[in-house]
């Protein structure tokens, strides 16, 4: 209901009464409606000690984003002719328009280069997509960052760069979405999505990870088994596999969800503390240099006192599962006392857990606080301070011998 009242034509305005969450003071704000446009390039900059790396973060493959990336890279190269290489960040990018994936590949490779093929049961669904234009720079060193949430068009770009040995892929294995879906119109304005084909990268491999053709007995879908995966070769003869997304050339550890951090986010405590912090700090340091102080973290821990948030550690979850099995198999009564002792030993202390996970909690607090002052661009800028994948990319691009070796050049 509130959304309906707030929405309207660009240029019109409305008034809203707001209450400060901390002082409870009320005020009336006048807001002018505007057409909101969200860029698929949330952060582009020259990074590194001497601004020698062109960093481009692409959040989604939207209309004309290929040209936007081309212009961004070109601008960074002109600003610093001594640029050592490009870092194309496709982490958390769910994909989008296939044509734009081809256009982005075309920035770094020649025209008439195969990027992706689609193959279906009917020949009408078989298509070949090639680059059509002139590259911006086909020799400039390139790294592509991916993670488990890089999917579809992101995987096509990363897979193409890997298959033709054009760039080094860094991060974690990608999602593995290699299915082409076609939308069919139905009655009553309804639509039906039908899987009609699969994507294949230049080496001939399919990146699809989930095997919908061999469901489990309960109907669930599992990943394609290793026995069904095939080997393929890149342009330089490196071995790559199908059936499981894109495996990076340099693997970095994935971040597992931390129970206490998840609990804090579920209750919006990190978000709320950032708002509280901003209400008492008119300004902060520049986004690139801002760090949460020890006293600020101590204040956050104190602020959490008495607040309701609960969670189970992985050890506690495993113990519960063990108890369930022991009860079913009639072993539990015999080990009940020992079980209780282990349970007591594993019981967690919230303050201790906060200190154990201090680094990640501070990271997330910084994200939220910086966003209050410098918005999403500031958040990305601050995150680059301790981004392990970006550091690895800069290291590779700074070492031509290692870069060439990773690509299988002889």
Segments (PLM) and residue ranges:
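Residues in well-ordered beta-strands of folded domains
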Residues: 17, 32, 57, 116, ...
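Short, solvent-exposed loop/turn elements at domain surfaces
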Residues: 38-41, 62-67, 202-203, 240-242, ...
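Residue-level signal for well-ordered alpha-helical segments
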Residues: 8, 33, 46, 65, ...
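Short, intrinsically disordered/low-complexity patches at protein termini
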Residues: 50-51, 79, 122, 140, ...
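Generic secondary-structure boundary signal with a strong preference for alpha-helix termini
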Residues: 23, 107-108, 124, 183, ...
